[in-house]
UniProtKB/Swiss-Prot annotation:
Lineage: Eukaryota, Sar, Stramenopiles, Ochrophyta, Bacillariophyta
Localization terms from the record: Plastid, Chloroplast thylakoid membrane
An individual GO BP term: photosynthesis
Coiled coil: none
Family: Belongs to the PsbY family.
Protein name per UniProt: Photosystem II reaction center protein Y
Organism expressing this protein natively: Trieres chinensis (Marine centric diatom)
Length: 36
């Protein structure tokens, strides 16, 4: 495992997980609003 690859991959993984978290949270809010 190249350390440079890890330096590049780590921020990408953080950004991707943060984006998915926000999308999931918004989706849950929309579902709750529709079912309410």
């Amino acid at each position: 495992m190249d350390s440079r690859l890890l330096v590049i991959a780590a921020p990408l993984l953080v950004a991707a997980s943060w984006a998915l978290f926000n999308i999931g949270r918004l989706a849950i809010q929309q579902i709750q609003r529709l079912s309410a």
